[in-house]
Amino acid sequence: MTSRLRLAIIGSGEIANFHVSAAKRSGFDVVGVAARKNSETVRVFAQTHEIPQTWSDPLQLIAEEDHWDALIIAASTEAVIPLLTQAIKIGKPVLVEKPIATTSSALI
């Protein structure tokens, strides 16, 4: 028997609902979610989707990489680059849901 991949998601907005539903239908175990600091929505989101662990700091979720195998970043555009930079350093698969920047100069 093969184990299911553990997926974490950063973001708890409307589009994140679709990502979690699709991930579960595709056989992932969604094990954690993080959103902005002090966000009540992350707790409600986790309860709604039966996600066992929450983080109030997305960078902390990334740092605790032993808890997950792959990551979806569904955060606001301005938040993506710092999160993606940290996630890439770990070397695990990352799906970025939104544009990573609003200008090409922001990518450099």
Q: What name fits each language-model region?
A:
Residues 1-49:
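N-terminal Rossmann-like dinucleotide-binding module
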Residues 53-108:
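Beta-loop-alpha module in the N-terminal Rossmann-like domain of NAD(P)-dependent dehydrogenases
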